[in-house]
Amino acid sequence: MERKSTLSSPGSSLESVDHSQPQLLHRYLTRENVQHLHQLFDQRKQLLPDELRAELFVLTGVRFSDEEFETLFMKINTDRDNFCQWDELISYLILGFHNDDPLAVQESLDLPISLDMSVKLGRQTYPVIKIEYSPMVSYDGTVNWSQGFWATSTQEAVINFWKRDWKHEKTGKAFSVDLKRAKTWILDTAVLPDLNYFCVACLEHELRIYDIIGSGFTLKIIVNRIPNPINALKYHFSASTRSKLIMGDYKGVLRVVEFYPERKEPFKFDAASTVTRLSFRDLLNGSYPQMECVDYGRLLPDIVRQLQFVEPTYSFLACSENDPLAPSGSRKKLYTSVIIQHLTKLDKITKIKVPKGVTCFAYDHVKDFLVTGGPDGELRMWDIRRPENPVASLSGHNAGVVFMFLQDGSQKIYSMDTKKIVKIWDVLNRILIQTYSQFSTTLYKTVPACAYYNDLNRELVIGANKVLSAPCCPKIPLEVTDGESHTQPISVLLYNPLFKVLISCGLDSYIIVWDHTMNRKLTIITDAHTQVVNGLLEQVQITAACFDPKLQLLLTGARDGTLKVWNFNSGSCMSSMSIQEGCEVTAVFWEPTSILAMGWNHAVVEFPVGTTGMDFPRGIDWQKLHSDDILCASVTHSEPKAIATCSYTGEIVFWLMETGQPYQRFNAAKPQQKIPVNAMTTKIGKPKRRSRMSVFMPQEQLRQRRLTRIVMPVKAEQLRQLTIHELLFLESRPMHPEVGTLLSSLDTGVIQVYSHHVDGGFLGSFNAVHMAGDRVVSMTTDPYNKFLFTGSYLGYVKTWLLEASFNRAALKMQFPFLLDDIIPGRAKRSVANQPLPWLLNSYQAHRNCITALSYIPATKLLLSASSDHTIRIWSLAGRYIGLLGSPVKWATIDADVPIPKEYGFRIPPDLQREVSFTTAQVLRGGERAIKLKSRILQEASERRRTEAVETYGQPLEDPIIKPEVFPYGYRAGFVHDAKMDYSFRETPIFEHLSIQNLTKLKVVDSKRVVEKVEGLDFSNDGDRIDTYHERNI
């Protein structure tokens, strides 16, 4: 490809164009180029490939190679009619911009609240009105949010304190100490973590402060005679500023009380009384120097509902609803609902007016982004720099909104209404993501609910008659795992060599197109297969998939028997069909003239391809030869084309692809005996659901330490039925009776070898597992059938050599598994007496079952999919590269060049500790991280001895012979050899050297020496240069 000029679209955010990817047309074409192409298509309606290629060269200056343009045109030509139309071209450009959008490719697969809620506290005696978490503050001012306690308050003045794991710690009662007939009615509470105090605002016009150090709950101070009851409290503490307690009362009056953070005991009490009483007027007048109170007056029209302090702007926010008792004529008037007041600059205030007022809000000071919710159930988004009108509104709640918070840099809004229904919103797209209603079905409808968002654990806690919690987009613990690729087990993993992308399908009904070189999601198809059950739309698990012969379309099969054809680049469904209602599809194949699908219907169903290539008439059932469900199948495209199918009972049937006629039949329990090819005469009923998908579920924790063999009776062995889990054709091998071309894996861990020739049959078998209870579930090979890759139920990946001639030394350098060990591992011991095939590699790639394998020959990469929802990339030698969909990034992989040895390989976090020695050796590339105790003690001893020599070594001594005897120092011929001491880790060389004292050497006149050297005559052979040394200079 040659690049003549670099063009960028006007207003494009891309500063430079990637010259190595000519298929990204949206990065090359300008707006004028697109308009020119539009006019050209209006005139010609459609373009041939050569015409489009010439036009793109004229517009962009990009010279495509034949292979590059063929791939590009196949991506554009979705109709597959060898003509390019305008809608196809513009759709391809739009998809290119969509793939470049970083927010589009980072779309989360899970819903924000995907896990079930958990019950923290059961039914409470008194409903909870306030939940708050208090961190632990050290004496030096260090705040530790991972250690703290929970505090729950009730209106009946009962305060409960709980540990971080919600175990009860203590209970306090905020009753009045005066003899009053009326009981205390709490309006709001606040924890003062840095002072170890608890503040209570009650309906008795009082503010009570309690000491909560240790197990006590002691009343210390009472601020009484407050003009109006305080309804809202918000406490803020920081090491850089004074601690502040913001208060809002029933009339909309706001006040701020400041404390001195440098004093550990801000309250000085009277020695004659255990409780200090202070009137509110004395607090305002400054009679109590430990606290300073500032009254900002009535800034809001009604009861203050929520408060928040913003430290960067040194201001606070407050909101209130409109007065419901106001006259009807004044209700239409807009009152101030939200205020942003600076603490010191009283004239610096921002007012926001909302109809009916505001009950709650969420504010992001970094983006100046404010979201408000009120009794009308509508969410309004504001830019506080322009508070006149909201930026946007979100409607969806059927009741008043009482709580909300922001998440992920103000990208998501969580809002809860009075009916305890939580809704999650996408701020950028302004759409509803999820509606979560489990809280409303668990809590009492008549009891108001309070909420608290724990930013540390990303957890929403809701309290009423119970205390419940639900994780909200929980963070991935990178020290334990790299994340997940799907939300449920992965069933299909395919590599498309045309587009050089990876496609995965899972039981979550997701189809994801991956750019595995950069760990990016290119396309996400959600709810690919669905069905309506009891009026609800439910997802259907995807169990099989394949590409069309041109590698442009994707065919998927689901558990309900439906088949769908997808354009995986655009995510559009192009056709749909079904083999039988309720029959799981276990294998699909797309041939040039037909589509073959099979599953629990016991037969192969053929859908002929219509004239247009996208219409599929009614399916035709082949001859029924299986007595049970078909579990897997494989196709060979070497002439003559054949297909092999196997059932749950171990039956293997070979079919001719062209005619659909069976020509061989075997049983895995007795592979040497050929079974006559006869049609099934018994009527097959409706298929029943089996536990076939158990490989995708969490497996048992097998604890067998060594492989054991159970000897069964001969009669029982003959009656045993063996299930075949996977079939694989070796297509590069010739069709010959003595050449093995089909591999079948049994549930005993044995792989059988068959020849699909008419005169062929069972040729042999070999053991492919080394753990008791394990079995091979997935298999794949390279195009030349040199390597065989097997994935087992326990998560092990093995690489086998299928060639008889090989270079053993070269393979040992390539595979660390082949290095000699002092004690061979179980994988090597299991194949010690098994000559062929040769085991090249064995390591644990996943903790759970490996459901699919895919090998990329160009880069020599092996990709494994597991029931643990992950897709991992491995090198041919077994080194771990990364996990698709993980937030952990790795260096970009070249799509056409094998990965270099200097690549920064890692070890999966879940495999760093509990793995076998063989797996650890493979994951480390042959480097041994374990040292013997004797070797460690020897190195420590040498280190101590060497450090002593280096630190306290003897100084250099003068030579014994005086310098006057030999004025020119020692001659080289008389210097004795130094005896070095090599017992240390570092040899002290200077201790054994004899160094001449240069300070007493005779100083030579250099000018005189140069003159004498110039006068030397070397013309005679008798003259020697040594004569100079014999003269007296």
Swiss-Prot record:
Keywords: Repeat, WD repeat. Pfam families: WD40. The keyword Repeat applies. PROSITE patterns: WD_REPEATS_1 (PS00678), WD_REPEATS_2 (PS50082), WD_REPEATS_REGION (PS50294). SMART domains: WD40. It comes from the Eukaryota. WD repeats lie at residues 54-96, 132-172, 181-220, 353-392, 396-435, 485-524, 537-578, 625-667, 719-764, 771-810, 845-884. Disulfide bonds: none annotated. SUPFAM superfamilies: WD40 repeat-like. This is WD repeat-containing protein on Y chromosome. It comes from Culex quinquefasciatus (Southern house mosquito). The gene is WDY.
